[in-house]
């Protein structure tokens, strides 16, 4: 019975993240929504790792790997956003066309 609640929470977080990522025009908000998506994936990995095979920690180890990737994204993402803001004076996604030039 607890599995359904955890999966519902994970699906709810994932859908909020996807909705925010699709509708967001601000780069900082898009990064926050990406973090929500990664956290929902981590919840699923840990839940299914515990459910199917609790002796082997493959899902837990992969979840730690995803957390490390999210930490790198949280460190590099704002640096890229601040660099774009310094050059373009805007952090709106639809106004940043750096690859067009």
Curated annotation (Swiss-Prot):
<dbReference type="Pfam" id="PF00420">
    <property type="entry name" value="Oxidored_q2"/>
</dbReference>
<dbReference type="GO" id="GO:0016655">
    <property type="term" value="F:oxidoreductase activity, acting on NAD(P)H, quinone or similar compound as acceptor"/>
</dbReference>
<keyword id="KW-0520">NAD</keyword>
<keyword id="KW-0150">Chloroplast</keyword>
<dbReference type="GO" id="GO:0030964">
    <property type="term" value="C:NADH dehydrogenase complex"/>
</dbReference>
<feature type="transmembrane region" description="Helical">
    <location>
        <begin position="32"/>
        <end position="52"/>
    </location>
</feature>
<keyword id="KW-0793">Thylakoid</keyword>
<keyword id="KW-1278">Translocase</keyword>
<keyword id="KW-0874">Quinone</keyword>
<dbReference type="GO" id="GO:0019684">
    <property type="term" value="P:photosynthesis, light reaction"/>
</dbReference>
<dbReference type="InterPro" id="IPR001133">
    <property type="entry name" value="NADH_UbQ_OxRdtase_chain4L/K"/>
</dbReference>
<dbReference type="GO" id="GO:0048038">
    <property type="term" value="F:quinone binding"/>
</dbReference>
<feature type="transmembrane region" description="Helical">
    <location>
        <begin position="61"/>
        <end position="81"/>
    </location>
</feature>
<keyword id="KW-0813">Transport</keyword>
<keyword id="KW-0812">Transmembrane</keyword>
<keyword id="KW-0472">Membrane</keyword>
<keyword id="KW-0618">Plastoquinone</keyword>
<dbReference type="GO" id="GO:0042773">
    <property type="term" value="P:ATP synthesis coupled electron transport"/>
</dbReference>
<protein>
    <recommendedName>
        <fullName>NAD(P)H-quinone oxidoreductase subunit 4L, chloroplastic</fullName>
        <ecNumber>7.1.1.-</ecNumber>
    </recommendedName>
</protein>
<keyword id="KW-0521">NADP</keyword>
<keyword id="KW-1133">Transmembrane helix</keyword>
<dbReference type="InterPro" id="IPR039428">
    <property type="entry name" value="NUOK/Mnh_C1-like"/>
</dbReference>
<comment type="function">
    <text>NDH shuttles electrons from NAD(P)H:plastoquinone, via FMN and iron-sulfur (Fe-S) centers, to quinones in the photosynthetic chain and possibly in a chloroplast respiratory chain. The immediate electron acceptor for the enzyme in this species is believed to be plastoquinone. Couples the redox reaction to proton translocation, and thus conserves the redox energy in a proton gradient.</text>
</comment>
<comment type="similarity">
    <text>Belongs to the complex I subunit 4L family.</text>
</comment>
<keyword id="KW-0934">Plastid</keyword>
<feature type="transmembrane region" description="Helical">
    <location>
        <begin position="2"/>
        <end position="22"/>
    </location>
</feature>
<comment type="subunit">
    <text>NDH is composed of at least 16 different subunits, 5 of which are encoded in the nucleus.</text>
</comment>
<dbReference type="GO" id="GO:0009535">
    <property type="term" value="C:chloroplast thylakoid membrane"/>
</dbReference>
């Amino acid at each position: 019975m607890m599995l359904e609640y955890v999966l519902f929470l994970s699906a709810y977080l994932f859908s909020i993240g996807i909705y925010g990522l699709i509708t967001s025009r601000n780069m900082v908000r898009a990064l926050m929504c990406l973090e929500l998506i990664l956290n929902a994936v981590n919840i699923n990995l840990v839940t299914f790792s515990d459910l199917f095979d609790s002796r082997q920690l493959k899902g837990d180890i992969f979840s730690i790997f995803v957390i490390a990737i999210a930490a790198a994204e949280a460190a590099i993402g704002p640096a890229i956003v601040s660099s774009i803001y310094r050059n373009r004076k805007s952090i709106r996604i639809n106004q940043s066309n750096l690859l067009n030039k």
